[in-house]
Amino acid sequence: MDLINSTDYLINASTLVRNSTQFLAPASKMIIALSLYISSIIGTITNGLYLWVLRFKMKQTVNTLLFFHLILSYFISTMILPFMATSQLQDNHWNFGTALCKVFNGTLSLGMFTSVFFLSAIGLDRYLLTLHPVWSQQHRTPRWASSIVLGVWISAAALSIPYLIFRQTHHDRKGKVTCQNNYAVSTNWESKEMQALRQWIHVACFISRFLLGFLLPFFIIIFCYERVASKVKERSLFKSSKPFKVMMTAIISFFVCWMPYHIHQGLLLTMNQSLLLELTLILTVLTTSFNTIFSPTLYLFVGENFKKVFKKSILALFESTFSEDSSVERTQT
């Protein structure tokens, strides 16, 4: 995965390092770096607070368990933002070494896959709870949710391994070090055969990432919530619309925030430096930062009257947001 560094494979020796951010104006680079630093500070504090409340101050339910790990995926993503910002300020020079280069890319991939997988799991959980209440009463337990959580982390880690392997540091002739993908895992950067291999692997990685990390979860979530919405409209199962609003907010925020990333990665395949490529890169950095920082806050405040929110304690707000909907659990199909 590439947010700041867009170099994936090489066309010829004169374009040994192709990085779209080289074309960014200094003001744009400063805005991106400042946004990343601020997002890192805010995200660490807010997401850390949310995790503490969900883990130690609330009863462990399927809801709280799934949302805890969803927010944990966002918290992990905030840990890499300072590295992105520092590299951005140094014109994408990477001075943290090869090991951190690999960890950086692997963590970025892990954060993306886990967040979308947990959003899908939350959608499936709501689908089962609403349309299969009898099965849910018998099987939908924190232990069952723990197995789902374990499966999500294992799947996301497995899908992130290639990006951990392919990521390497590259030294150009001017002494600049970049953290970039070397899909052929070869030190022969100028070989035409290796360039062609890198291109094919890059295309394969893009397609698999787009299908598994975006398109398939999108269809799963759309199916689940279409069925849930139909059932809710038919029987008026929920006491309030808050649970549905919380999940829809999580879904919309994720797809709005990650869509620019996939568009940017698709544009990279065209190998054309353009204003659109530059704009999508800036938008990608800003929206993914927003996703990791503000999405958890939206879960808490959506559907609430702000005057009431500010009068509530943090714990009461969490309990109101993530409480199980008992009316759905009791409904029989």
From Swiss-Prot:
Query: Record's CDD domains?
Result: 7tmA_GPR33 (cd15120)
Q: Which residues are glycosylated?
A: N5, N12, N19, N272
Q: Which of the residues are on side Cytoplasmic?
A: 54-64, 125-143, 231-246, 304-333
Q: Which UniProt keywords apply?
A: Cell membrane, Disulfide bond, G-protein coupled receptor, Glycoprotein, Membrane, Receptor, Transducer, Transmembrane, Transmembrane helix
- The disulfide bonds in this chain are C101-C179
Q: Does the keyword Membrane apply?
A: yes
Q: How does it sit in the membrane?
A: Multi-pass membrane protein
- Pfam families tied to this protein: 7tm_1
Record field: transmembrane: 31-53, 65-86, 104-124, 144-165, 210-230, 247-268, 284-303
Any idea where this protein resides?
Cell membrane
Residue ranges annotated as Extracellular topological domain: 1-30, 87-103, 166-209, 269-283
What are the annotated GO cellular component locations?
plasma membrane
InterPro entries to which the protein is assigned, alphabetical: Formyl_rcpt-rel (IPR000826), GPCR_Rhodpsn (IPR000276), GPCR_Rhodpsn_7TM (IPR017452)
**Family per record:** Belongs to the G-protein coupled receptor 1 family.
Function according to Swiss-Prot or TrEMBL: Orphan receptor; could be a chemoattractant receptor.
UniProt-recorded name of the protein: Probable G-protein coupled receptor 33
**Species this protein is from:** Pan paniscus (Pygmy chimpanzee)
